Regions:
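Surface-exposed cleft-lining segments at the edges of enzyme active sites
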Residues: 88-92, 117-133, 169
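Acidic/histidine-rich helix-loop elements
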Residues: 4-13, 123-125
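Structural motif corresponding to alpha-helix initiation and N-cap regions
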Residues: 16-17, 97
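Short aromatic-enriched loop/helix-cap "lid" or pocket-rim segments at secondary-structure transitions
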Residues: 18, 44-45, 73, 127, ...
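Active-site beta-strand/loop signature of hydrolases that rely on acidic residues for catalysis
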Residues: 3-9, 22-44, 103, 114, ...
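Metal-dependent phosphoesterases centered on the DNase I-like endonuclease/exonuclease/phosphatase
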Residues: 51, 131-192
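Internal catalytic-core helix/loop-beta-alpha segment
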Residues: 95, 102-104, 127-141
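Structured beta-strand-rich core segments of catalytic domains in phosphoester-bond hydrolases
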Residues: 36-120
């Protein structure tokens, strides 16, 4: 059985060694990190290199690292005990293509398409969140004969309520704890 752990590091540089140690103690075959920075990536790679054969981050795919500022400074990293090949065929139509790290991992049983994503939060990036989710959906809707794993931080839903289920960011939870669709969302109707 293949064991995978996905973890948002919350771009905390000082806590990286402790977070990574906690994950390594669980001995996963594949690790998928989100909110990795250029600086933290080199630290993570150094720590994991003794136990993981293949390690890649989304920054390696950029033609220029000059875009790694502001909300685009955060990326993803995949580490595995198996051989991997970066999937350079980017089938995702989205504003920030580096928000999906796609690799093919060759396990003893199979080659798996493995996707690690970090969806930008809508509160600070407006429509980029929706466009990224749509691009991810459309890209994965393309048929593949290989097994696939998708993991990451999707920055959704807002909440999961026992009585009402999933509550999206397009809803407001009233004082009685009941979710209602917002009439105006971020000073707009939500229509495009």
């Amino acid at each position: 059985m293949l064991k995978c752990i996905t973890w948002n590091l919350a771009h905390r540089l000082k806590k990286n060694p402790k977070q990574i140690k906690a994950i390594e103690e669980r001995n996963p075959d594949i690790i998928a990190f989100q909110e990795v920075t250029l600086e933290s990536s080199s630290i993570i790679k150094k720590i994991l290199s003794s136990n993981y054969r293949s390690i890649v981050d989304s920054f390696e795919l950029l033609s220029s690292q000059s875009v790694c500022v502001g909300p685009r400074r955060l990326g993803e990293l995949i580490a595995t005990k198996y051989d991997l090949k970066i999937n350079l065929e980017n089938k995702f139509s989205m504003p920030w293509k580096e928000r999906v790290l796609a690799v093919n991992i060759k396990t003893p049983q199979d080659t798996i398409e493995f996707y690690n994503t970090y969806i930008p939060p809508g509160s600070t990036n407006r429509w980029k969140k929706i466009e990224t989710l749509e691009g991810l959906y459309k890209g994965l809707a393309i048929h593949s004969k290989r097994k696939r794993i998708l993991c990451g931080d999707f920055n959704t839903p807002q909440d999961e309520l026992l009585k009402y289920g999933v509550c999206t960011f397009a809803q407001k939870i009233n004082k009685k704890g009941v979710p209602r669709l917002r009439k105006i969302f971020r000073r707009g109707s939500g229509n495009r």
